[in-house]
From Swiss-Prot:
Protein name: Imidazole glycerol phosphate synthase subunit HisH
Gene behind this protein: hisH
PANTHER family referenced in this protein's UniProt entry, alphabetically: IMIDAZOLE GLYCEROL PHOSPHATE SYNTHASE SUBUNIT HISH
Binding partners and assembly: Heterodimer of HisH and HisF.
Alphabetized HAMAP family for the sequence: HisH
Domain of life the protein comes from: Bacteria
Subcellular location: Cytoplasm
Gene3D superfamilies: 3.40.50.880
Described function: IGPS catalyzes the conversion of PRFAR and glutamine to IGP, AICAR and glutamate. The HisH subunit catalyzes the hydrolysis of glutamine to glutamate and ammonia as part of the synthesis of IGP and AICAR. The resulting ammonia molecule is channeled to the active site of HisF.
Amino acid sequence: METVALIDYGSGNLRSPAKALERAAAGCHASFQVLVTSDADAVRKADRVVLPAVGAFADCKRGLSEVPGMQLMAEGGREYGVTEGLGWIKGEVVKLEPADPTLKIPHMGWNELDIRREHPVLAGLRERAHAYFVHSYRFAVERPEDVIASADYGGPFAAVVGRDNLVGTQFHPEKSQETGLALVANFLTWRV
């Protein structure tokens, strides 16, 4: 049985992501144990690692040393001051500023994904699949090839980024119903 470590860094509800991982594993008939942990050794030993997207960039960075969420993969972020990121994907986390001033921040709700390139984690998703977003900042990715999918909210932004064995989503897979469960199942069965 493989282990999925869901990192508990003290910043939110982990029940929803844990249940989504369990449902996706059952749906793809994969044998996974979901372990909610803050133990670095357990994270290192896990077959897969998930960092839920809860909290501000600066708060997450302070409480975490090894495994990034999508925005922590950046070189830095500007939420609550300038904070150094892990630098695994070139770019910076900046305030989401839609061109249309009537659009509210945070961007909260359903939005279409525009798949930019094929990736195993997005395999089988229908064209223009919808995902659920809640965010006020976006990852301004430097290299277009690191953007797997984008969405638009008064201008395009990176919705899924990835390189090598790293993948991150701006949206909440656990709240994105069919799209989210498919993505999580693909993540669980993805072999690098």
